[in-house]
């Protein structure tokens, strides 16, 4: 599919990897479970970190999967992690049941995001005007929000079959950020809604990395000036990264383990999209099949 706002070669690469991914379906329950677990941790950590949450990747895992409390971290940061995991499960269930997206679903997602954090605002459009720090765009006044969200849903249903999934997901994300319908949680809401679109269409969730936070905000600013190319290419690369992670996991599962033997985690980083720190953490916590030889973790 040709596109004026995303690099054509990038879009073709994404769609090619999606076809390759579809060829592996149905996924084995073990692989599907492990990928869901890894993406839930990474997605939760990065999306919250972009908004200023100081929980590390490992701490996020301890909070959402083991129910632990982290010293010197705020209660709000704990709830942000817990709530985000709950929303992700909500999205997976929503997709599995093939439900239809509407404003009530958006409000239900937001209610979970701010649960035990700002209960009075959770699941409600804002009734006050807001500013986005460092942005060139001033969000619309609160009185316009209901009408704008109604138009947003009309736009979505008009364009969902006309655009590529990558473009549709990118536009949904950008338009929600632009409207800024909530008093808090707009960034997380936009990224979750983008991923709901991807999941509904058989894509893995796209994780915008905290290390790319500055670039992320920069391309959003450019989009506010109606310069969309860098923004959509940024979103496209995030989607492609997730596809690569899925494909590498599925291909590794299909290969005979004794064909390769054990390799170091440093070598493994060249075969996947994860860094040495994250692979080491997965090995230590038993989420990555690995053995320790002397002082070094080795994996297949």
List each model region and its residues.
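FIC/Doc superfamily catalytic core
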Residues: 1-184, 188-300
């Amino acid at each position: 599919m040709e596109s004026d706002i995303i690099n054509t070669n990038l879009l073709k690469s994404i769609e090619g990897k999606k076809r390759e991914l579809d060829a592996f379906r149905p996924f084995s329950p073990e692989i599907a479970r492990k990928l869901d677990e890894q993406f839930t941790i990474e997605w939760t950590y990065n999306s919250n970190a972009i908004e200023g949450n100081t929980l590390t990747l490992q701490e996020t895992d301890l909070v959402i999967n083991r129910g632990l409390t982290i010293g010197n971290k705020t209660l709000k940061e704990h709830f942000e992690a817990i709530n985000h995991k709950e929303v992700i499960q909500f999205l997976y269930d929503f997709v599995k049941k093939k439900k239809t997206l509407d404003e009530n679903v958006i409000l239900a997602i937001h209610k979970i995001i701010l649960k035990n954090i700002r209960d009075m605002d959770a699941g409600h459009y804002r009734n006050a005007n807001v500013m986005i720090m460092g942005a060139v765009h001033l969000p619309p006044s609160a009185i316009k929000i209901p009408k704008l969200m109604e138009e947003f849903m009309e736009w979505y249903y008009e364009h969902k079959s006309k655009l590529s999934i990558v473009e549709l997901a990118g536009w949904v994300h950008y338009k929600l950020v632009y409207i800024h319908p909530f008093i808090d949680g707009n960034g997380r809401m936009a990224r979750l809604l983008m991923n709901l679109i991807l999941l509904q269409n058989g894509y893995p969730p796209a994780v915008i990395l905290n290390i790319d936070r500055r670039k992320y905000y920069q391309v959003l600013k450019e989009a506010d000036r109606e310069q969309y190319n860098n923004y959509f290419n940024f979103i496209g690369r995030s989607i492609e990264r997730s596809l690569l992670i899925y494909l590498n996991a599925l291909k590794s599962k299909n290969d005979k383990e004794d064909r390769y033997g054990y390799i170091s985690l440093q070598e493994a980083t060249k075969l996947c999209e994860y860094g040495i720190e994250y692979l080491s953490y997965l090995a230590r916590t038993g989420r990555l099949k690995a053995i320790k030889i002397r002082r070094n973790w080795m994996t297949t």
